Amino acid sequence: MNISISITLSEVLTQARKRLYYKGESLKEGDAIQLATTLQASADEDDVLTPFAQSAAERMCDLINKTASVNYSFGAGAFSFSITAPANFDENQSPLIKGSIFKFMVNRVIGEWLSDVAPNIAKTYFELSMESERDIVTRIAKRKKPVS
């Protein structure tokens, strides 16, 4: 079975910027105003964020290739993954895999952005991306019925 997943760069960057904004706003209380301002990213930083998203997509391919075959491309502002799932794959997992890949990419972008300015906060986002990695591996392994 073939699973086709397309995720646009703009979706990933928009979500990452939004979450960075909310994180920055939550830190504006007290002495953390300077840090809060540093955390936030705008569309002006897309040239910095884009390579983080591309790196996340490549890392995702490496992960998927451990359990299934994947072809990956990036063009026209979209990441395209074509996954050849194992026999008897539960296709109900496909949208959940897409969601986990999206979360993984967003959290990796945020983690990379924060790694220089707030490594202690970046660690949280790298851990969240690792949770998505585990979820993807588990979902790719799901079958309609057990293989005997």
Regions found by a protein language model. Give the residues of each.
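Short, well-structured alpha-helical interface segments that form or flank functional binding sites
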Residues: 47, 51, 55, 100, ...
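Short, charged/polar micro-motifs that form catalytic or ligand-binding hotspots
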Residues: 39-46, 50, 91-100, 115, ...
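Conserved short "hinge" loops at termini or chain/domain junctions
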Residues: 1-89, 128, 134-148
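Short conserved catalytic/interaction loops centered on acidic-Pro-aromatic/His motifs
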Residues: 118-127
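Amphipathic protein-protein interaction modules
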Residues: 73-115
